[in-house]
Amino acid sequence: MFPERVLSGMRPTGALHLGHYHGVLKNWVRLQAEYPCFFFVADWHALTTHYESPEVIEESVWEMLIDWLAAGVDPTQATLFIQSRVPEHAELFLLLSMGTPLGWLERVPTYKDQIEKLKEKDLSTYGFLGYPLLQAADILIYRAGFVPVGEDQVPHVEMTREVARRFNYLYGREPGFEQKALDAAKKLGGKRAKLYLELRTAHQERGEDDALEQARALLAESQSLSMGDRERLFGYLEGARKIILPEPQVLLTEASRMPGLDGQKMSKSYGNTIRMREDKASVEKKVRTMPTDPARVRRTDPGDPGKCPVWQLHQVYSDADTREWVQKGCRSAGIGCLECKQPVIDGILREQQPMLERAQKYMDDPSLLRAIIADGCDTAHKVTQETMREVREAMGLTYS
C-alpha cells in the first residue's frame, strides 16, 4: 500500500561509542541499501529525560550526525533529519493523544524500568509518560513499514500498531464506503477486479491468509490507483474502513554484544566506552589499562582468557589465529597482558580509520552537514504533510 519505508532514530544525549556502531549504525548501513530509510535525530525524545540540561542535546546533535556519516550512513541512500524541524511529528502526537487510553502508556514495560534506573531525575512528567506515543507518531507520520528494534523495544512497536488500529477504526469510516470501494475495484480492470473480489472473499469468509497477501500484492502492483482508492481497497480487504495509518512491522535486530572496557556491555552509564572517533592516544591508554584475569599478578603467572575482559574484545577484533595465540599464550604465561592487548588496540584503530576519514570533511566544512540535514528535513516534510492532510481530513479538521 505504501513504500516499505524503514524508520529509526537516536537521542542526542552524548558522544556515540563503538557500542552504538556495532549495535545500531552497522545495521542502518545495511538497511539503507535495501529500503527507503528515514533516520532522525530524536531531540524531542532527549528532552523527556534531559529537560533540565538542554545544552547536552544542543552539543550532541551535530556531533552525532557526523558519527552517523562516519559510520557509513549515506545521505544519497537514506533521508537524515532532525525531529524538531518537522513539526508534523508534534501535531500527530497531539491528535493521537486524544484517543489513546492512558493505560496503554502506563503498561509499556520500559516506562517503569526507566523511572527505576534514572532515580536521580524527576521523570514524573507528562512528556516522559507520553514518549511511547511520540514514538508512535514518529513512525506513523511516515507510514513506515518496518522499525528496526531490539527485543526491549518490541512493546513500543506493538503499542504503535494498537494506536494505528484504533485510529483507523475510529476515523477510517466514511459514508458509502463499500460502494466507493467497489467503484475503486472496477478501476483495476475487469480481470483484476474479479480476482481482487475473489481473494477478498477467500480471506474474509474462509480465513485464507495467502489470499490476503495475494490481494495486497495485486494492489501494490496497480500503479494507476489514486491514494484514496488504494486506501479504500486495502481497508476493504479486512473490513469496512480505510487504512489511513498502516501498522508497522518489527525488524528485530540482534542485541549489541560489544563489550566495554570492564567486560560489561559497553554503555555510557558504566563509564566503560571507547568513542567512535576517540583519538589514538586515548584508545591506547584505555585498552592498556583494562583489568585482566586477577590470577595474572606477575608476568609468569598463567591466566584464563574467559575471566579477562580483553578476551571479549579479541572476539570482536581478532582473527582465529590471533585468538588461538591469545588462548595458548595466556594459559601458559607465554605472553604478557600488554602483548595480549596490542592486537585489540590495532583492531580498534583499524576500524576507526575509515570513520575518521569520512568525518573529516564535515568537520572541516560544517556547511556540508547543514545542507544534508536541510535537504533531509525538506524530504521528510513532504511526506509528513501528505500524511497529516489525510489525518486532518479523516478527523474532520479541514474546515472551510
From Swiss-Prot:
NCBIfam families documented for this protein: PRK12283.1 (NF008922), trpS (TIGR00233)
Intervals of motif 'KMSKS' region: 265-269
A GO biological process held by the record: tryptophanyl-tRNA aminoacylation
Compartments reported by the entry: Cytoplasm
EC number: 6.1.1.2
Subunit text: Homodimer.
Keywords noted in UniProt: Aminoacyl-tRNA synthetase, ATP-binding, Cytoplasm, Ligase, Nucleotide-binding, Protein biosynthesis
Biased composition (Basic and acidic residues): 295-304
Catalyzed reactions per annotation: tRNA(Trp) + L-tryptophan + ATP = L-tryptophyl-tRNA(Trp) + AMP + diphosphate + H(+)
Region of interest called Disordered, as start-end residue ranges on this chain: 280-305
InterPro entries for the chain: aa-tRNA-synth_I_CS, aa-tRNA-synth_Ic, Rossmann-like_a/b/a_fold, Trp-tRNA-ligase, Trp-tRNA_synthetase
Keyword match Aminoacyl-tRNA synthetase: yes
Gene it is expressed from: trpS
Domain of life: Bacteria
Segments of this protein annotated with the region Insert: 173-241
Coiled coil feature spans: none
GO CC terms: cytosol
Positions that bind ATP: 268
Single GO MF descriptor: ATP binding
Family (UniProt): Belongs to the class-I aminoacyl-tRNA synthetase family.
Name recorded for this polypeptide: Tryptophan--tRNA ligase
